[in-house]
Every structure is written in C-alpha cells, then in structure tokens.
C-alpha cells in the first residue's frame, strides 16, 4: 500500500501545485 501513497502525493502536488509532505 505504501507504493500507492507516493503516487497520490505526486497527483495532489501536481493538481494543487503545492508540496504535500503532510500527507
């Protein structure tokens, strides 16, 4: 499941345009 976490982080980071290190 850990593999899915970084992918979502990148998606959020690209969509929001902000660094999502909290997630």
Curated annotation (Swiss-Prot):
Location(s) in or outside the cell: Mitochondrion inner membrane
Q: Which Pfam families does this one have?
A: COX7a (PF02238)
Tell me the keywords, alphabetical order.
Answer: Membrane, Mitochondrion, Mitochondrion inner membrane, Oxidoreductase, Transmembrane, Transmembrane helix
Tell me what topology the record assigns in the membrane. Answer: Single-pass membrane protein
Q: Which domain of life is it from?
A: Eukaryota
Which Gene Ontology cellular component terms are annotated? Answer: mitochondrial inner membrane; respiratory chain complex IV
Q: Which residues form a coiled coil?
A: none
Q: Name one GO molecular function term.
A: oxidoreductase activity
What SUPFAM superfamilies does the record tag this protein with?
Answer: Mitochondrial cytochrome c oxidase subunit VIIa (SSF81419)
Which pathway? Energy metabolism; oxidative phosphorylation
Any GO BP: mitochondrial electron transport, cytochrome c to oxygen
Where is the major localization of this protein? Answer: mitochondrion
Q: Provide the assembly information.
A: Component of the cytochrome c oxidase (complex IV, CIV), a multisubunit enzyme composed of 14 subunits. The complex is composed of a catalytic core of 3 subunits MT-CO1, MT-CO2 and MT-CO3, encoded in the mitochondrial DNA, and 11 supernumerary subunits COX4I, COX5A, COX5B, COX6A, COX6B, COX6C, COX7A, COX7B, COX7C, COX8 and NDUFA4, which are encoded in the nuclear genome.
Q: Which family does it belong to?
A: Belongs to the cytochrome c oxidase VIIa family.
Q: What does this protein do?
A: Component of the cytochrome c oxidase, the last enzyme in the mitochondrial electron transport chain which drives oxidative phosphorylation. The respiratory chain contains 3 multisubunit complexes succinate dehydrogenase (complex II, CII), ubiquinol-cytochrome c oxidoreductase (cytochrome b-c1 complex, complex III, CIII) and cytochrome c oxidase (complex IV, CIV), that cooperate to transfer electrons derived from NADH and succinate to molecular oxygen, creating an electrochemical gradient over the inner membrane that drives transmembrane transport and the ATP synthase.
Which protein, by its recorded name, is this? Cytochrome c oxidase subunit 7A-liver, mitochondrial
Species annotation: Oncorhynchus mykiss (Rainbow trout)
């Amino acid at each position: 499941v850990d593999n899915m976490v970084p992918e979502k982080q990148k998606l959020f980071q690209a969509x929001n345009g902000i660094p999502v290190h909290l997630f």
